[in-house]
Amino acid sequence: MPNIESAIKRVRTSANANAKNSSQTNAMRTAIKKFEEAVAAGADNVDALYNEAVKAVDMAATKGLIHKNKANRDKIRLSKLAK
């Protein structure tokens, strides 16, 4: 445990950031999985789930959670599934 006040604050701040980043990444993965399962099942709401998944991927890329090239790769893969 750090003794310096600024280091203590930094530990708190990084823990909060880690929690937010993990939550955002998990939300992205969940949206992608929901879309893939809907495509496999032939559900009616595929378009809405596709838009939600792409939005989650874009948000993760914007916040720096994933690289922009990975975001583009994921979106292309999802669009191929949607067709």
UniProtKB/Swiss-Prot annotation:
The gene is rpsT. Keywords: Ribonucleoprotein, Ribosomal protein, RNA-binding, rRNA-binding. This is Small ribosomal subunit protein bS20. One of its GO terms (molecular function) is structural constituent of ribosome. The keyword Chaperone does not apply. The keyword Cell wall biogenesis/degradation does not apply. InterPro entries: Ribosomal_bS20 (IPR002583), Ribosomal_bS20_sf (IPR036510). GO terms for biological process: translation. Belongs to the bacterial ribosomal protein bS20 family. It holds the Pfam family Ribosomal_S20p. One of its GO terms (cellular component) is small ribosomal subunit.
